[in-house]
Swiss-Prot record:
Entry protein name: Subtilisin-like protease CPC735_013710
Keyword Translocase: no
Protein localization: Secreted
Residues with glycosylation annotation: 145, 241, 254, 341, 381
Length: 407
């Protein structure tokens, strides 16, 4: 899907924060994400909030605006050293914000999409592939033996920012819990299926890579698309929950989502990384260079492309230098909505990313990995090189759990 294409830009002190041309069909009218400059003191941030509230009220009163533009700040976000907020604003207030000495950028909020799965017929090769060094088999149906350490992610928390998770699904055996619901006036349940599917690949008893990990649901979607207003709310909550619970080295975030490049969210992921938190993301399903996508282009996320059983890249999978590795992403069965035993077979980088998030959880449970840099290095060190046909400039690396070297 083609969304907005934003470029990274930097602002000098007191310079005007000029808007970047965007794809208007994906902009959410009247709604903005404002990023404050680094290094502001608490007093400066408070002064900015006071100034904004007064300026916005004055402009709304003068012009008689109503609707989303009159709502002002919805939510402030703080992720490590990053300060930002989502707001409904009129154009005059936006112009004044862009001249503020405290503001780094003011960007229209935009839609972001699930890296959505496509339903296919029967399947089941993916877990066997993860423990087989990626060697192709005469038939995908013969890749049925998944070998793994029995610790299997125990004591690790996998956060799924998605459509919610059916925590009562039999795949989770009571190991899934509800965390944050960022969608107003909607229940924290998965009526769409995508989040349950993703969580099942990470930690399901049958379909999961890390079969004893705990899944934490953060609902930021109520269908196939959402906005950064809700994405940032869930992501901020996850980072705070991990930090407050003192489990940075035992937690992983999965983002099976994709949109056009959007610098504020890339910065949020980078700040989580600097805070010591690992994020795994889908490369996206546009069949293009993943450097055009967020969160795929986030420099310190682990970006995952999709792979078929015979070591070919499906045409839908994004590619390029920002992709770190490939994992199974076609004909993958996992849990679904429609009942506590429901399953679905599907394809997409939405399936590839949770294989690696599950691998991260698995490795965290059996090894001492104290930082996201160590996690990334270990995952990439275990990969099998040179197997992917048509890698299209991506690092030619395939995810592997290292079990044969551990036996």
């Amino acid at each position: 899907m083609q969304l907005l294409n934003l470029s990274l830009f930097f602002l000098l002190p007191f310079a005007t924060a000029n808007p970047i041309p965007q794809d208007s069909q994906n902009i959410i009218p009247g709604q903005y994400i404002v990023t404050l400059k680094d290094g502001l003191t608490t007093a400066e941030i408070d002064a900015h909030k006071t100034w904004l509230a007064f300026t916005h009220r004055s402009n709304i009163a003068a012009k008689g605006h109503s609707g989303i533009e009159s709502e002002g700040v919805f939510k402030h976000f703080q992720i490590h050293k990053l300060n930002m907020y989502a707001a409904g604003l009129d154009k005059k207030t936006v112009e004044e914000l862009r001249r503020s000495p405290h503001v780094k950028s003011v960007l229209p909020d935009q839609k972001i999409y699930l890296a959505e799965a496509v339903t296919q017929s029967n399947a089941g090769w993916n877990l066997g592939y993860m423990s087989s060094k990626g060697q192709p088999s005469p038939s995908w149906s013969t890749l049925t033996n998944y070998t793994y350490d029995s610790t299997a992610g125990e004591g690790v928390w996998a956060y799924v920012l998605d459509t919610g998770v059916n925590v009562n699904h039999v795949e989770f055996e009571g190991r899934a819990i509800l965390g944050r619901n960022s969608i107003p006036n909607r229940p924290h349940e998965d009526t769409f299926g995508h989040g349950t599917y993703v969580g099942g690949i990470i930690a399901g008893k049958t379909y999961g890579v890390a079969k004893k990990a705990t899944v934490v649901s953060a609902k930021a979607f109520d269908g196939g698309s959402s906005s950064y207003r809700y994405i940032l709310d869930s992501y901020e909550w996850i980072v705070k929950n991990i930090t407050d619970s003192d489990r940075k080295s035992k937690s992983v975030i999965n983002l099976s989502i994709s949109g056009a490049k959007y610098q504020p969210f890339d910065e949020a992921i980078e700040n989580a990384f600097q805070a010591g938190i690992t994020t795994v993301v889908a490369s996206g399903n546009d069949g293009r260079d993943a450097s055009q996508n967020t969160p795929a282009s986030s420099p310190n996320a682990i970006t995952v492309g999709a792979l078929r059983w015979e070591n070919t890249r499906p045409g839908f999978s994004n590619y390029g230098k920002v992709v770190d590795l490939f994992a199974p992403g076609e004909l993958i069965r996992s849990g679904w909505t429609g009942g506590n035993n429901a399953t679905r077979v599907a394809s997409g980088t939405s399936a590839a990313s949770p294989h690696v998030a599950g691998l991260v959880a698995y490795l965290m449970s059996i090894e001492t990995l104290s930082s996201p840099s160590e996690v990334t290095a270990r995952v990439l060190n275990l990969t099998i090189p040179g197997l992917v046909k048509d890698a299209r400039g991506s690092p030619n690396k395939v995810a592997y759990n290292g079990i044969q070297e551990m036996l």
